[in-house]
A protein has these predicted regions:
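Well-ordered secondary-structure scaffolds
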Residues: 1-232
């Protein structure tokens, strides 16, 4: 079902080359490297039957990529990477370069092993940002991502090292805040795996359109302290 869902959209759109990112992690959709390899093998076989060339990037799915979870918050991360902002999420930048590099190699634009550097050059010299702006203009123009009227931090209850993030519960938290139905709603992460955490410091900030959604999200966070595992 997953293979049909993913590939049918690509085939219907008329794609000839497809690069797919497969995040692997205990709370990701794909939990082991073996499962990722099996999925990519089956998907490759189906894709080849339709004349579709594929490549797979197996990535770390132990934690969310970037800081924002929710349409506008994720868009802010993307824009920060494209314009080269000093505080742009480095993990999102690296993931984007890996995938873009794979696209360049699969399409024959770059020799194998050189796609990453070609993608990095296009990002660093502004060509990627210029192309993104052109794509937006072709679809009606650039728009500033909306901001939610209500925000509230959720703080760590103890000090220590962040050792685990439950991706499924993080996703649930963002949905309770209103994402993705409310484009500005969601959460912003303030910590990454391996970070030192101080009790009382914010782990996430919840963004919501309505007081009820904000309350639902914060109540869920309070009832699920294992969203973030912190070891002393």
């Amino acid at each position: 079902q997953l293979i049909a869902s993913v590939l049918s959209k690509k085939i219907a759109a008329g794609a000839s080359h497809v690069v797919l990112d497969l995040p692997v992690g205990l709370t990701a959709k794909i939990r082991t490297q073996e499962a990722a390899r099996d999925l990519s093998a089956h998907m490759t076989a189906v894709a080849e039957a339709f004349g579709l060339k594929t490549r797979f990037v197996l990535s770390d799915g132990a934690q969310p990529v970037g800081r924002g979870i929710g349409p506008a918050l994720e868009a802010n991360d993307v824009l920060a990477v494209l314009v080269g902002a000093p505080d742009a999420p480095t993990d999102l930048r690296e993931r984007a370069l890996a995938i873009a590099g794979a696209v360049l190699e699969l399409s024959g634009t770059a020799p194998d092993g050189q796609g990453y550097e070609l993608a990095r050059a296009a990002l660093d010299d502004g060509r990627a940002w210029a192309k993104f702006q052109a794509i937006c203009e072709a679809q009606g123009g650039m728009r500033t991502p909306p901001s939610a009227p209500l925000t509230r931090p959720w703080a760590a209850a103890r000090s220590g090292i962040l050792t685990n993030i439950n991706n499924r519960k993080i996703s649930r938290l963002a949905k309770l805040a209103g994402a993705p139905d409310d484009p500005a709603a969601g959460i912003v992460l303030h910590v990454r795996l391996g970070d030192g955490v101080v009790a009382g410091a914010p782990l996430v900030t919840v963004h919501a359109q309505a007081p009820g959604q904000l309350a639902y999200a914060l109540d869920y966070a309070a009832a699920n302290p294992d969203i973030f595992e912190i070891e002393a």
